[in-house]
């Protein structure tokens, strides 16, 4: 069996920044550090940060007075932000991915201008909740759609005063179909100046598509609640190849590999490389040969952490 590695795969700039913010806060201010929601959707990362002194909570009311609080990479609503600022907290850091913040600004701009806004995204995802929560104009409207069917069933106040934006971690193909439906249903709707689906999501979907062309099966390293990891597995399955979303090498079932001559491996944007290396080692134990990395798009984007945290600290092992 041959192992093929997708390129790029794994951590993106937004995830790197979010994890660094938590690590550096622990290093500089000591444990515990409170984080609203999982800082990124990866079990290994969350468990590693818990071991170092991070406490993950869902409600601001769970944070004791005088504590340090960090918002996750997925972003928060204006209501959550206001609640946190009203508390007696020592420090408040925002680990929201800058590309999510870009979408937040688009929604806030629409709200100020009185335009109705339509968000393409998955209901219940924290990024969607945070993005929807940027709209506050009572005379306008904020709507969520997930599919072309949702678009055709949508009722708005003024079809001539609409804009749309998207969750950053969606399937490029699925989103294109929804945008086509929006443009057909509402010819005067205005989209973002630049695509809201982030570079890392797009690059990883392109890379796994190339990987699936050559692989018999594909293993996607990522947690079940990771939106972008799920989209990678779905893309492969739509190409007619088996794909399995795994948290770690321990999840690999030997029968998956029966008859496979080429095993593809990729990782979602919130999955650390150590997990990929463990998967490679496990596959070699099961008889696979050396791994070969495919060519792909180079990524050199870096997002700075807040200036208060710009010191060198140890990284997660």
Swiss-Prot record:
It comes from the Bacteria. The active site is at 127 (proton donor). Binds 1 [4Fe-4S] cluster per subunit. It is an enzyme of class 1 (oxidoreductase). Its cofactor is [4Fe-4S] cluster. Pathway: Isoprenoid biosynthesis; dimethylallyl diphosphate biosynthesis; dimethylallyl diphosphate from (2E)-4-hydroxy-3-methylbutenyl diphosphate: step 1/1; Isoprenoid biosynthesis; isopentenyl diphosphate biosynthesis via DXP pathway; isopentenyl diphosphate from 1-deoxy-D-xylulose 5-phosphate: step 6/6. One of its GO terms (molecular function) is 4 iron, 4 sulfur cluster binding. CDD domains: lytB_ispH (cd13944). Its EC number is 1.17.7.4. (2E)-4-hydroxy-3-methylbut-2-enyl diphosphate binds at residues 41, 74, 125, 168, 226-228, 270. Isopentenyl diphosphate binds at residues 41, 74, 125, 226-228, 270. Belongs to the IspH family. HAMAP family: IspH (MF_00191). Homodimer. This is 4-hydroxy-3-methylbut-2-enyl diphosphate reductase. It comes from Yersinia pseudotuberculosis serotype O:1b (strain IP 31758). The gene is ispH.
